[in-house]
């Protein structure tokens, strides 16, 4: 049963997006009020606001994304938190903090600094996302393009555009990276999801897959962060990647791709629609999150419901729980799984009421 832990009146206008840092208990928000805010994910401290990022974007902040921690870096001084925010003003802001984790968590306020402003898109930015090691940042826009930016994840001083992908026919709503490899997915108003990889021979990025099946705008997609399918298919020399997507057509669909252990041609990568989750939503579904801990999937959308799905041993999906009117009469724009400072897992939602709600799933 989904129960409310805390409702934060974070913004004076719509809250569009939320992002949680993977190792430091911090939560970032994005809003039409042109600000991003950062909160501590601490029940004991009552989820205090520790920073407000403002006076940079001229229009709505549509998306936020924390940079993942550097792999294998143990010192907090070498890997400080950073945040990307994407705006309807067509720019991306990169924010950083000079305090180690111990000071971040003990201080009532954190000083976040603007490190870079990235320009290139011609229209509103709809989503931003970092790859698994923070060396690449993807952005998508109403201008029908996906841009990939390369940076040094230790300094974040410069961002170079290394690819502009224009395969979609309409507005692109969302981008997301695979949690462990450089595989990128984009979701679009043209009812499709596209997958991109870099060619190892010439370093060019290209579309390596198109997922057709939705009968309306695809608002969001998320990769599964789970190694069990890879482990279970070791004997067949194939690894399995799964992706969940949600759409205007009120469905959530799971797609899977088998990749041979030695791949020579793009044609050897085969995607298939694995399942459609049991129907619950009565209006468009805007956001989906796949838990790395429990394997559960959570969806939200225009009808104000939170729906949680659980997978059985036979790979069939069932409804775990439903929360009606999670933001009153308002639409819900974003949902994520996050870890509190005690390592317990929660759901976080952002709605048209400007509230960011934290839930016990």
From Swiss-Prot:
UniProt cross-references to PROSITE patterns, sorted A to Z: WD_REPEATS_1 (PS00678), WD_REPEATS_2 (PS50082), WD_REPEATS_REGION (PS50294)
WD repeats: 10-49, 56-105, 120-160, 167-206, 213-265, 280-319, 327-361
Cross-referenced Pfam families: WD40 (PF00400)
Coiled-coil ranges per UniProt: none
Location within or outside the cell: Cytoplasm; Nucleus
Keywords: Cytoplasm, Nucleus, Repeat, WD repeat
One GO CC term, this protein: nucleus
InterPro entries, A to Z: CIAO1/Cia1, G-protein_beta_WD-40_rep, WD40/YVTN_repeat-like_dom_sf, WD40_repeat_dom_sf, WD40_rpt
Chief location: cytoplasm
GO BP: any one term: tRNA wobble uridine modification
Quaternary data: Interacts with NAR1.
UniProt record similarity statement: Belongs to the WD repeat CIA1 family.
Role played: Essential component of the cytosolic iron-sulfur (Fe/S) protein assembly machinery. Required for the maturation of extramitochondrial Fe/S proteins.
HAMAP family: ciao1 (MF_03037)
PANTHER family given in the database record: CYTOSOLIC IRON-SULFUR PROTEIN ASSEMBLY PROTEIN CIAO1-RELATED, WD40 PROTEIN CIAO1
Protein name, UniProt field: Probable cytosolic iron-sulfur protein assembly protein 1
Natural source organism: Scheffersomyces stipitis (strain ATCC 58785 / CBS 6054 / NBRC 10063 / NRRL Y-11545) (Yeast)
UniProt gene name: CIA1
């Amino acid at each position: 049963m989904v129960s409310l832990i805390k409702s934060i009146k974070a913004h004076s206008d719509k809250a569009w997006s939320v992002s949680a840092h993977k190792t430091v208990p911090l939560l970032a928000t994005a809003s039409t009020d042109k600000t991003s805010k950062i909160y501590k994910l601490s029940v004991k401290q009552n989820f205090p606001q520790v920073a407000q990022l403002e006076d940079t974007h001229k229009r709505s902040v549509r998306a936020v994304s924390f940079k993942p921690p550097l792999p294998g870096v143990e010192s907090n001084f070498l890997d400080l938190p950073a945040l990307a925010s994407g705006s309807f003003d067509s720019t991306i802001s990169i924010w950083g903090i000079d305090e180690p984790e111990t000071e971040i968590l003990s201080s009532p306020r954190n000083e976040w600094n603007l490190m870079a402003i990235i320009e290139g898109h011609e229209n509103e930015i709809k989503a931003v996302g970092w790859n698994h090691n923070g060396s690449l940042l993807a952005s998508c826009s109403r201008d029908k393009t996906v841009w990939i930016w390369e940076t040094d994840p230790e300094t974040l001083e410069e961002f170079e555009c290394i690819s502009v992908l224009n395969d979609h026919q309409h507005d692109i709503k969302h981008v997301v990276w695979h949690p462990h490899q450089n595989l990128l997915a984009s979701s679009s108003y043209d009812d499709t999801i596209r997958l991109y990889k870099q060619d190892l021979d010439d370093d060019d990025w290209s579309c390596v897959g198109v997922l057709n099946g939705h009968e309306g705008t695809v608002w969001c997609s998320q990769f599964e962060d789970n190694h069990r399918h890879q482990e279970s298919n070791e004997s067949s020399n194939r690894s399995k990647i799964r992706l969940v997507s949600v759409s205007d057509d009120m469905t959530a669909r799971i797609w899977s791709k088998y990749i041979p252990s030695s791949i020579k041609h793009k044609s050897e990568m085969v995607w298939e629609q694995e399942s459609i989750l049991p129907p619950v939503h009565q209006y468009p579904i805007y956001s989906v999150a796949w838990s790395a801990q429990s394997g559960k999937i959570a969806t939200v959308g225009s009808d104000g419901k939170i729906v949680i799905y659980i997978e059985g041993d036979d790979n069939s999906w069932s409804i775990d729980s439903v929360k009606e009117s999670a933001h009153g009469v308002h639409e819900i724009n974003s949902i994520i799984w996050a870890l509190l400072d005690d390592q317990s897992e929660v759901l976080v939602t952002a709605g048209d009421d400007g509230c960011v709600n934290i839930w016990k799933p």
